[in-house]
Amino acid sequence: MSIKASDISSIIKQQIKDFNVTSDKKEIGEILTVGDGIAYVSGLENARLGELVVFENENYGLVLNLEEYAVGVAIMDGSNDLIEGQKVRRTGKVISVKVGDQLIGRVLNGLGEPIDGLGQITSTKTRKIFQIAPGVMTRKEVNVPLDTGIITIDSMIPIGRGQRELIIGDRQTGKTAIAMDTIINQKDKDVLCIYVAIGQKNSSIAQIVQKLKDHDAMKYTTVINSSASELAPLQYIAPYTGVTIAEEWMANGKDVLIVYDDLSKHAIAYRTLSLLLRRPPGREAFPGDVFYLHSQLLERAARVTKEFGGGSITALPIVETQSGDISAYIPTNIISITDGQIFTIESLFKSGQRPAIDIGFSVSRVGSAAQIPAIKSFASSLKLELAQYNEVKAFAQFGSDLDETTTNILKHGQKIYEILKQSQYSPISQFYQAIILLAIKEKLISQIPVEKIRKYRSELIKFIKNNSEIIALRPIIEKEKINNDIKEKLIYSIKSFVKKFILENDIIIDNGQNNDVQFINKK
């Protein structure tokens, strides 16, 4: 069989016609400029927003800007090794992270890679870190309580599984302490925890990890650390990495608690990125999409129906204010996104009230739906009593002659604040909280001097622990509505304890109208 020259010629012409000389150029680009953790790359015409690219030094970058002649890439690591003219390769993949139970008890960086020296994570399952939040029909009502172990929160600002509750306040007012106590209180409650540290000091995170280990909390906790020394892109990515890991557990029917500490620094990292990418600045130099930055993150916290796994993600974002100003840009944004806020104030903290929560400004929009019936019943008037106390206290400063009712409100309010004081790492279970709240409601603290209130609380818990009749009622008190018979039994037990406590502590009851008490002066 002979081959004609004309056939060969036509085949070659066809192949030349079909040959695409631009295909390779679109996959491999070149660095135009590099600096401050940002590289501008030409030639990646088909790059997608959020896509990973690989530099010559095998480090990754994240495409954040798509412009006419170049793309803006955030460098994840090794920016000092990059120079103009180096090649950049597309991966065709968006950024994703390993997920699964292997991550429990580990300390990871912002990309989900282990930094605790305990070996690599061998899980093969991954999830994209930028996901759409669950839709309306996917969600379930938030009505299962998430116990914090903090009486002030569980009684007046209850948090439900699937809720987003903001912890907001000035620096050094105990915001992280509230989040840490909540994580520690999840022991034996079948809740997995994720602590995301954004822009914190490495020494602070080391202390937090050690405290979690000391309280056996690392057995159900994952720590993600993107410290202040790391590049802004890693700080920007970290919370999305955390919620992606949480979503895998939620899809498997598990309840997850995630803490973002803190979103103020996250917003600053994003502002840094945006300014370096030459995006137009807006209010306080933040870019126009800073609201979406946090709404897309926090909306991923939910309690979903069984068809979508039946699990939940409860988010506790932390935001730092300046001089108590909650009307600043980032605080108001996040307040409007979340389902309530816990507001910590410096004056309360310095006065010794721990946790330093301002009850007047703090609110939970889920409310009593996320409380056990006993606490819902016994704490129903607590917030009102404290509001009356604060109002009367303000007026009492202007005059010395106070009537009996006003005096009683002041004394009772002072004792309530004292009994609500809680030192860090000492959570109280909801069963004992219910007993304490009943004692407050029935005025069974009125005969106890303020100085003895905290001792009264700890002794009451010990007394109940040794009362087999009340301990037998624990399953009912923790889950069911309390009937009058059970309530009377509890009141009788508390009254018995009060008599015992008064005798043991040499307290004399003043028979006057104010029912005041004083110590016996022993010579």
Curated annotation (Swiss-Prot):
Subcellular location: Cell membrane
Translocase keyword on record: yes
Binding partners and assembly: F-type ATPases have 2 components, CF(1) - the catalytic core - and CF(0) - the membrane proton channel. CF(1) has five subunits: alpha(3), beta(3), gamma(1), delta(1), epsilon(1). CF(0) has three main subunits: a(1), b(2) and c(9-12). The alpha and beta chains form an alternating ring which encloses part of the gamma chain. CF(1) is attached to CF(0) by a central stalk formed by the gamma and epsilon chains, while a peripheral stalk is formed by the delta and b chains.
GO MF terms held by the record: ADP binding; ATP binding; proton-transporting ATP synthase activity, rotational mechanism
PANTHER family: ATP SYNTHASE SUBUNIT ALPHA, MITOCHONDRIAL
Lineage of producing organism: Bacteria, Bacillati, Mycoplasmatota, Mycoplasmoidales, Metamycoplasmataceae
Stated family: Belongs to the ATPase alpha/beta chains family.
Name of the protein in question: ATP synthase subunit alpha
EC number: 7.1.2.2
